[in-house]
From Swiss-Prot:
Dioxygenase that mediates demethylation of actin monomethylated at 'Lys-84' (K84me1), thereby acting as a regulator of actomyosin-processes. Demethylation of actin K84me1 is required for maintaining actomyosin dynamics supporting normal cleavage furrow ingression during cytokinesis and cell migration. In addition to proteins, also demethylates DNA: specifically demethylates DNA methylated on the 6th position of adenine (N(6)-methyladenosine) DNA, thereby regulating Polycomb silencing. The keyword DNA damage does not apply. Disruption phenotype: Embryonic lethality. Conditional deletion in developing juvenile mice leads to spermatogenic defects. Interacts with ZFHX3, MLLT3, MLLT1, HSF4, EP300, TES, EIF3C, MTMR6 and PSMA6. Belongs to the alkB family. It comes from Mus musculus. This is Alpha-ketoglutarate-dependent dioxygenase alkB homolog 4. It is an enzyme of class 1 (oxidoreductase). Its cofactor is Fe(2+). The lineage of its organism: Eukaryota, Metazoa, Chordata, Craniata, Vertebrata. GO terms for biological process: actomyosin structure organization; cleavage furrow ingression; demethylation; positive regulation of gene expression, epigenetic.
């Protein structure tokens, strides 16, 4: 029965507008995204040990780097047993078709971001299986006071050509930290700067943190921002946190070529200051928090 349901889903897609997946490209003879958009020319790899983005090996930018703040990567955040149980419980509920070959499950209020309006609309909280995960987040520096009010589960599949286009998450409702738990397979999150202009690079003779600090003295090369892409390798069962510049000044995306096997991602979002104590919608924010942290929710 499950296999038949999957075959049925493979014949459908949720793409709208310019978005495409393998299914609609084959059925409607649409061009895949890489025939429309050129790949970035200046590729960097994020190094979690230094917090810098370094030019890809073998490229013209090898040996050059720049600081890339606002990224925290926590490996082995859940155990293999916890991962299997979380995905099993997710699969007990229906997945809805979404854009670009993804499927999704939403636990959160119904939001109209364009009109900046929201309503509870049946939102009863985050799922029970996330309670221990959220509690564990509070044990890590920078997440001690993290209180998510929304969880979005996304299912990526190479058979559907799943991907997600470069985008910035909303900042009217959602707060400073975006927290994503990566399950079932590793992937790459691709970051691109929003601002025009040039990006200054420093010589990066080695991957030692002290060498990176020394290289701050003399930026000696620049590259156009519109050609820059930073690849963050996200291992299976790891937690990725984006804050600051990485949250607000760099778009994030996942390219189709980086989905090698089924990948499930649970992204947790907190409230912005407008919905926190002292904000003009603090009462609504308190209602959302109370519902979310009851951990009694089903997908809405």
């Amino acid at each position: 029965m499950a296999a038949a349901a999957e075959v049925s889903l493979l014949q459908e897609c949720g793409c709208k507008g310019i978005r495409t997946c393998l299914i609609c490209e084959r059925q409607r003879h649409r061009d895949p995204p890489w025939q429309i958009c050129l790949q970035k020319k200046c590729c960097f790899l994020y190094c979690p040990d230094t917090g810098w983005a370094a030019g890809a090996e073998g490229s013209d930018l090898e040996g050059w780097a720049f600081p890339f703040p606002g990224v925290t990567l926590i490996q082995d955040f859940v155990t293999p047993e916890e991962e299997a149980e979380m995905v099993r419980l997710m699969d007990c509920d229906p997945w809805k078709l979404s854009q670009s070959g993804r499927k999704k499950q939403d636990y959160g209020p119904k939001v109209n971001f364009r009109k900046q309006k929201l309503k509870m609309a049946g939102f009863q909280g985050l799922p029970g299986f996330s309670q221990k995960v959220v509690q564990r987040m509070g044990l890590y520096p920078g997440l001690e006071d993290f209180q998510p009010v929304e969880q979005c589960n996304l299912d990526y599949s190479p058979e559907r050509g799943s991907a997600i286009d470069p985008h910035l998450d909303d900042a009217w409702l959602w707060g400073e930290r975006l927290v994503s738990l990566n399950l079932l397979s590793a992937t790459v999150v691709s970051m691109s700067p929003e601002a025009p202009g040039s990006l200054l690079l420093c010589s990066a003779p080695s991957v030692r943190p002290d060498a990176f600090e020394d290289s701050l003295v003399a930026p000696s090369r620049s590259v156009p921002c519109q050609e820059v892409e930073v690849a963050i390798t996200v291992p299976r069962r790891s937690l990725l946190v984006l804050t600051g510049a990485a949250r607000h000044q760099w778009t994030h995306a996942i390219h189709r070529r980086h989905i090698k096997a089924r990948r499930v991602c649970a992204t947790f979002r907190e409230l912005s200051s407008e919905f926190l104590p002292g904000g003009k919608q603090q009462e609504l924010g308190q209602e959302l928090l109370q519902a979310a942290l009851s951990f009694q929710g089903r997908p809405v």
